[in-house]
Design a protein with these regions (language model features):
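Catalytic core of pol beta-like nucleotidyltransferases
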Residues: 1-32, 38-45, 56-109
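Short, aliphatic-rich beta-strand segments
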Residues: 50-53
Length: 109
């Protein structure tokens, strides 16, 4: 798995604000990008951004609210629609194979 460096200026320019504003607030431990942005096929007009997040406290009350709020704020910060998944949401083996082939680490705390 490669770390994102020149992946997408949109992401690279916002990594530090993302870490400061969102990661600590929502208990995010790890954030990866996959799909068109990770493959270099990102279309600035039509593409959304696909992420896999690992957050603390998945069994704690309020986790679903934190997850949804994180997704909303991530979209606002990036100015694009986002699809946010966790590892446990990726159950289809064909989808898993595609995700695993393209995923790139953005942040790990």
């Amino acid at each position: 798995m490669d770390t994102v460096a020149p992946l997408l200026p949109l992401l690279a320019d916002r990594l530090e604000p993302l870490r400061r504003r969102l990661c600590n607030r929502y208990g995010m431990d790890r954030l990866e990008v996959f799909g068109s942005a990770a493959k270099g096929l990102f279309d600035p007009v039509r593409s959304d951004l696909d992420f896999i997040v690992q957050m603390t406290g998945q069994r704690e009350p309020g986790y679903a609210r934190r997850f949804c709020s994180f997704a909303d704020e991530l979209a606002a910060l990036l100015g694009r629609p986002v699809d946010l998944l966790t590892e446990s949401m990726i159950r289809n083996p064909y989808f898993r194979k595609d995700v695993d082939a393209t995923r790139r680490l953005l942040l790990e705390l």
